[in-house]
Amino acid sequence: MSFLWSTVSFLIVIAVLVTVHEYGHFWAARKCGVKVHRFSIGFGKVIWSRTDKQGTEFAVSAIPLGGYVKMLDGRNEEVPETLKSQAFDHKTVAQRAFIIAAGPLANFLFAIFAYFLVYSIGIPSIKPVIDEVRPQSIAAMAQIQPNTQITEIDGVSTPDWETINMLLATKLGESKVDLTLVEFGSNIEQHRTLDLSNWTFDPEKQSAFGSLGIVPVRSKVDMILSKITENSPAEKEGLRKGDKLYWSDNSKIEWYTFLEKVQEGKPLTLKVERDGVWFDKTLTPELNEKKRWFVGISPTFYPLANEYRTELKYDMLEALQKGVEKTFQLSWLTIKVIGKLITGNLSLNNLGGPISIAKGAGASSEIGLIYYLSFMALISVNLGIMNLFPLPVLDGGHLVFLVMEALKGKPVSEHVQNVSYRIGAVLLLMLMGLGLINDFLRL
C-alpha cells in the first residue's frame, strides 16, 4: 500500500509540475506568435488528444515521466513561405530566449503560488527550541545550551526545524556556520560559531542538526509499551503492552536514541519491568517492507506543550511575500548544493533520483495536503533550477547557444549543436543513472 501510495503521489507531482513547465513554454510561444503543433503530457504513444481552433493538439501520452511542446521549426521540418513568420527559428533571439526561459519561470511562479497557499492556510510547526545538546558534539564544543531557540543561521531567519535542517545541510563542506539564539521566552541574543571542518553526516540516517549534537524539543516519550506489532521481533520475544524497557545497565532509554540504535540492525540487550518483576530480553531488529530496521514496539507519547507549538500563517500580502522569499531562498540553496556537487565539497552519494522523490511525495501526502503542497513547491523549484543548468539538452543549454548567437551575430553551427546535444544527453543520463543507483542503495 505504501509503495502504491508513493507511486501515485509521485506521478501526480510529476504530472502537475511538467504541465506547469510545458505550459510556460506554450504560453510564451503563443505570445510570440509561434505555431504550436502539440502540447503533450508524457512521452511515447498518444492515448488521448484534442485539437483547438489554432491547430494545436493537446495530448496525454503513455509514459507519464515528462512532457514536451512541439513548435513549428524550420530546423526540423519544411516550413512553407506563408508560415515562416510563425516558425520558432524565424523569431528574434530575445523572443526565442523568452520562450525557452518561460518553462523554468513557470516552475518558480508555481512554487511562489504554492507557498502563498501554504502560508495563507497555515502550516503547523514546532518552534526550533533545543531540548538537549549531546556531550562531545560540535554543538557542545560551541557551548550551545539547552532551552535556547535558534532564530538565525548565517543571518537567515529560522522559523522552524525544516528551515534549520535545510540551511545546515547546505553548509556541508564549509569551515564554519554562525548561529543566533535566544533563551526560550527571552529576547536576549546569543551568537555561536560551529566548527564544521570535520563535520560529516548521512542525510538518509539523520538530520543535519542531529548530526551536530542538537536535540530538538519534541513530544515526551515514556518507554512503557503502548502497542506491540503482530509478528514483530518484540512479539516473538514475548514483550507485552505495559512493559517498561531499560538498557541492560538499568539506565533510562531515550526513545529517539533507541530508534537510532535500531537502525544499526544489531541485537539490543534490554531490561524489562513487568508488574514489579525484572528480566532480560534481547531484541534483534528485522527489515520491514520499506527495507528499514524495526523491532515492533510503540512507547507512550505525551503531547508537546502548546508553548512550543506554532503555526506559520500570515495575511495574504505577507503570505505572498513569504512565498517569494521561500522560493528565492530554495533556488539559491539548490544552486549552492549543485556547486558543491561539482567541486566535490558534497559527495555525489547525496544525489537522489525518482525513488527519493517518490518516497518524499508519499510521506508528505500521508501527513496532509498542506505538506504535500509544500513538497510540490520544493520539487518545482528544483525542476526550474535543474532545467536552467547549462547542458545542451536542457533549457539552460539552449539559452547558452542563444547568448552565443547574440554575441556572434549568427547561430551556432548545427554540427556544434548536434555534438553538444549528444554530450549533454550522455551527461544527463549519467546523472540520472547515478541518482537512481543512489536510490537503490538506500532501499
Sequence positions of predicted segments:
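Alpha-helical transmembrane signal-anchor/signal-peptide segments
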Residues: 32-37, 122-140, 145
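Internal alpha-helical transmembrane segments
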Residues: 67-135, 158, 185-186, 372, ...
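Functional transmembrane alpha-helices
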Residues: 86-87, 91-94, 207-236, 241-385, ...
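PDZ/PDZ-like peptide-tail recognition elements
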Residues: 97-131, 166-174, 178-226, 280-308
